[in-house]
């Protein structure tokens, strides 16, 4: 199975990539940062997913996409978190071998807590996920989102310190 993970260089994305590699999958990672993974079954692209033209052509069909890339409390929250996920999904998801698309939304999408642009971007992801689920149904694929609360990653330092 070929897996695509955005935001694969740290936090949740890094750990998910490691897990898929441990299970023997081919993993393709997208991130603004360099990869910390050294594995022959891992292919890393240091790219900005909010720029459609930066997305590479990939040989073979992607079977699982984890839209995980996310910024918090920046002017780029909507462009990165929502538009970036849309760019990745629209380019790679609609193929005959797709099995599943998963979005890392946030509990903030429901509660409205935290930063305004972040909340809007994550709530938008939930709505977009529903749209993708309808369009993926003819492929026999699933589409879901997870809405985690606070996770101890470097991107949550500001929230955890309550500043």
Predicted regions and their residues:
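Conserved glycine-rich Rossmann-like NAD(P)H-binding loop of the short-chain dehydrogenase/reductase
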Residues: 23-37
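A glycine/serine/threonine-rich, flexible loop-to-helix segment
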Residues: 150-163
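Hydrophobic structural elements of the Rossmann-like NAD(P)H-binding subdomain
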Residues: 66, 102, 143-146, 156
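Catalytic loop of short-chain dehydrogenase/reductase
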Residues: 100-124, 129-138, 150-152
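N-terminal Rossmann NAD(P)H-binding glycine-rich loop of SDR-like oxidoreductase domains
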Residues: 9, 17
């Amino acid at each position: 199975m070929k897996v695509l993970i955005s935001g694969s260089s740290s936090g949740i994305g890094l750990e998910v990539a490691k897990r898929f590699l441990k299970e023997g999958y081919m993993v393709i990672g997208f991130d603004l940062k360099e990869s910390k993974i050294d594995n022959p079954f891992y292919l890393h692209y240091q790219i900005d997913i909010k720029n459609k033209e930066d997305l590479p052509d990939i040989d073979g069909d992607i079977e699982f996409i984890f839209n995980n890339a996310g910024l918090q409390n920046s002017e780029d929250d909507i462009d990165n978190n929502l538009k970036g996920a849309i760019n990745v999904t629209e380019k790679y998801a609609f193929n005959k071998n797709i099995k599943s698309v998963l979005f890392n939304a946030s509990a903030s999408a429901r509660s409205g807590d935290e930063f305004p642009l972040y909340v809007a971007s994550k709530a938008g992801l939930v709505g977009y996920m529903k749209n993708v689920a309808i369009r993926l149904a003819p492929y026999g694929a699933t589409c879901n989102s997870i809405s985690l609360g606070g996770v101890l990653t470097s991107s949550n330092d500001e929230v955890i310190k309550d500043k």
